[in-house]
Amino acid sequence: MAVLVVSRGGGGAGAAGWAARLRAAAPGVEVRAWGGAPGEARPPLEDVVHAVVWRPPPGLLARESLPALRGVQSFGAGVDHVGALPAGVPLARIVDPAMSQRMASFVVCNALNHIRCTEDYRSAQREGRWAGHLAAERERDVGDVFAGVMGTGEMGGAAAEMLRAVGFRVRTWSRTRRRGPPAGCEAFVGREELREFLGGSDILVNLLPLTPETSGLVNADFLAHLPPGAFFINVARGGHVVDEDLLGALDSGRLGGALLDVFHEEPLPEVHPFWGHERVLVAPHVAAVTSTETALAQIVDNMRRTLEGRPMLNLVDVAAGY
């Protein structure tokens, strides 16, 4: 029995580095690494029973490639990168409580920066311009601003709670009622309530899982229902957004600005118009980086569970996608 580690484009230690960590943590376990680069030879796969993956190549996890596969572990909290799995093969993700707090603080920081015009003051500083008039003309009191959070999972719930704690008026939206919103937040559920939710969200935070139902959700029609000048924070996945429609809303002034931490292609290509757009702040997918120590402990535990025939922890509902 063997374990396969595959990591493509995720930065950090890469497949070889993670494989070395797993070997050190679990002596005697056969751990093989594959970076998935074009032309890179694959290691033997026929006896692989457990795979630890980040953006595996399409088809790698199919039964034809890994006939002995019994369990798959994502390197991150998200699993949209994994792709299709053979029927009956369980999928686990990383659950890091501190990650939710890191995400929440990132969201709150950028929401406050927006209503206090921080980027405008930085622009004025570069120009040597005293811009005290902005305080009266554009700044807003936190208690007058409605922050809408899409997604009420661990991260969405943490972001909603922290936004409310600093004084924002918080509303949440989720596709289903699987989990309720934090106390004190106005809840909206389902497609039939989405427009009402959007219409009252001065700041919109996307923390939805990426599924076939949410892919491309943030399009021209969606953005048209936000209040004029709304601010969009995307810290979920780039696949939620139709880039051309978002750029159109920004160019027209319909949308006041956007903080984007995730993209269709990462790293974001140098020629992408987001880089130079005056209303866009680009972050390199750093809103909530997984703790290496936390991830390693969970990965090793689930690896051993699969090898010993025990159920993994932090399992994903494969049909739902999260």
Predicted features and spans:
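N-terminal glycine-/charge-rich "phosphate-binding" loop or analogous flexible N-terminal tail
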Residues: 1-50
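Phosphate/diphosphate ligand-binding glycine-rich loop within oxidoreductases
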Residues: 46-126
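Redox-cofactor binding/interface segments in oxidoreductases and associated redox assembly factors
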Residues: 51-53, 74, 205-206, 234, ...
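Short, conserved loop/helix-junction motifs that constitute active-site signature segments
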Residues: 60-68, 83-88, 223-228, 249-254, ...
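C-terminal helix-to-coil terminal segments
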Residues: 93, 99-106, 120, 124, ...
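Glycine-rich NAD(P)-binding loop of Rossmann-like domains
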Residues: 122-158
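NAD(P)-binding Rossmann-fold cofactor-contacting core
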Residues: 165-183
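Rossmann-like adenosine-cofactor binding region
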Residues: 177-273
